[in-house]
């Protein structure tokens, strides 16, 4: 079905369409999104060569991301996380409950023992962005803010597919190059919104192979 959709879109023309909630009638962005979706499916199926090929034609910059863009911070039009917190289910959604935080938040938390930061990586800003205040919708300034867009298909996913698929098919160096391209995007602020885009709280310097050998900053235990 995706291949047929890509073929049909290839024969169409782009035109401004207000009813297209994602790409305003831009066929090239739709085609790229379809390729990213194909890459996602093939990666899950462990078809790494095909996944890499599809990702090569997928979303190539964050300007091509497929996002759900809330119309306003009002019920029925807002960020879906915010909708849950603002309704009768406040307290049911969050990543810090009863003194326990989610693994994602632990990985991003500079004060936690599971933190994955190092001399080349500072995740403080993303930790703030992805933290959810489960007690109040209005208390959220990041991923669960009422007007915060929500990703569906993105450059970041596409780039990380390229990183994994490249490493599995062409070797570590190829995968690392694609990973560093993703990190370079993070260094621009990535998906951080204005509340969390503070350059003093993030850093994503490029890795080198030595960082991953035994004793390197990403392999201190030599596994």
What are these regions (language model features)?
Residues 6-27:
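Flexible helix-coil transition and linker loops at the boundaries of alpha-helical arrays
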Residues 23-26, 30, 147, 154:
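Structural signature of alpha-solenoid helical repeat junctions
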Residues 1-2, 27-33, 55:
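All-alpha RGS (Regulator of G-protein Signaling) helical domain and cognate RGS-like helical scaffolds
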Residues 2, 46-159, 178-180, 185-223:
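Hydrophobic-face positions in mid-chain alpha helices that act as interaction patches
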Residues 170-175:
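A short, structured loop/turn motif at beta-sheet edges
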